[in-house]
Amino acid sequence: MMKNPLAVSIPGLTLKNPIIPASGCFGFGEEYANYYDLDQLGSIMIKATTPQARYGNPTPRVAETPSGMLNAIGLQNPGLDVVMQEKLPKLEKYPNLPIIANVAGACEEDYVAVCAKIGQAPNVKAIELNISCPNVKHGGIAFGTDPEVAFQLTQAVKKVASVPIYVKLSPNVTDIVPIAQAIEAGGADGFSMINTLLGMRIDLKTRKPILANQTGGLSGPAIKPVAIRLIRQVASVSQLPIIGMGGVQTVDDVLEMFMAGASAVGVGTANFTDPYICPKLIDGLPKRMEELGIESLEQLIKEVREGQQNAR
């Protein structure tokens, strides 16, 4: 039997291919199930879940930018109970689709409460920890910008979680390396990166920011070079697996993420412009890998990581 060249294995996740719709760009999968069989995907990162329902920020929440978009959705979601009782059971009809649950909160207790429960869902195989949220107990500073706070949060959720934890790193920091190292010391099983870059657009007629929240997260092709740089940086100091994301829209983008040090790839904003983007990437990968002399993604991951170790 021929080995699947697209298969990758990372903590908690045995993936038939590395393509994962990113959290916040795929809802809870229901909308995209009308377009194609979700079982084709490697995994799904579902929308952020908080202990209680959140209604999000006032509108407008989205603004177009050259080669990207700004969003300030505000973690709108139905809350943990609805996700557990309604959203996740609907995805159980896809037996070959491991779910990564994205968890967010306003304080450490929020994260602990959600992580303790959500991993008990039979199809949730890993948790993605969104640490770009403001910490209300510490003046609203994001959890992911302070190594000590990030360490404590990671350690706290690891104590209660029954599935591996992937911490989502923010690019809105001076130096990402000490934060990644603190998270690894806290017991994380891997990283997902990068989250959005903070940005703003101004309406020339009103002379005010377009977004009601004023600032929003920049995503799309514009941020890919930033993602590649930061993935490479983190991969050079840590052996933990990385789910790379940020501006992926082509097969070459996927392979570039792997060559930077990723072990799987998240696809976000591209889902809005082409609902079929994930199946297209999965279909296109084998041919491009053959052209580039890549036997398998597992082999590519091994070669890249060994090269980075030798370069230290």
Curated annotation (Swiss-Prot):
Binding site for FMN: 23, 47-48, 102, 130, 168, 194, 220, 246-247, 268-269
InterPro entries, alphabetized: Aldolase_TIM (IPR013785), DHO_dehydrogenase (IPR050074), DHOD_1B (IPR033888), Dihydroorotate_DH_1 (IPR024920), Dihydroorotate_DH_1_2 (IPR012135), Dihydroorotate_DH_cat (IPR005720), Dihydroorotate_DH_CS (IPR001295), Dihydroorotate_DH_I (IPR049622)
Cofactor note: Binds 1 FMN per subunit.
Classification via Pfam families: DHO_dh
Principal location: cytoplasm
Assigned keywords, A-Z: Cytoplasm, Flavoprotein, FMN, NAD, Oxidoreductase, Pyrimidine biosynthesis
Entry GO CC: cytoplasm
EC number: 1.3.1.14
PROSITE patterns: DHODEHASE_1 (PS00911), DHODEHASE_2 (PS00912)
Keyword Oxidoreductase: yes
GO molecular function: dihydroorotate dehydrogenase (NAD+) activity
Binding-site residues for substrate, renumbered to this chain: 47, 71-75, 130, 195-196
Entry superkingdom: Bacteria
Compartments where located: Cytoplasm
Reactions this protein catalyses: (S)-dihydroorotate + NAD(+) = orotate + NADH + H(+)
Cofactor(s) this protein cannot do without: FMN
Active site: 133 (nucleophile)
Associated pathway: Pyrimidine metabolism; UMP biosynthesis via de novo pathway; orotate from (S)-dihydroorotate (NAD(+) route): step 1/1
Recorded family membership: Belongs to the dihydroorotate dehydrogenase family. Type 1 subfamily.
Quaternary context: Heterotetramer of 2 PyrK and 2 PyrD type B subunits.
Function per UniProt: Catalyzes the conversion of dihydroorotate to orotate with NAD(+) as electron acceptor.
Protein name listed in UniProt: Dihydroorotate dehydrogenase B (NAD(+)), catalytic subunit
Gene, per the UniProt record: pyrDB
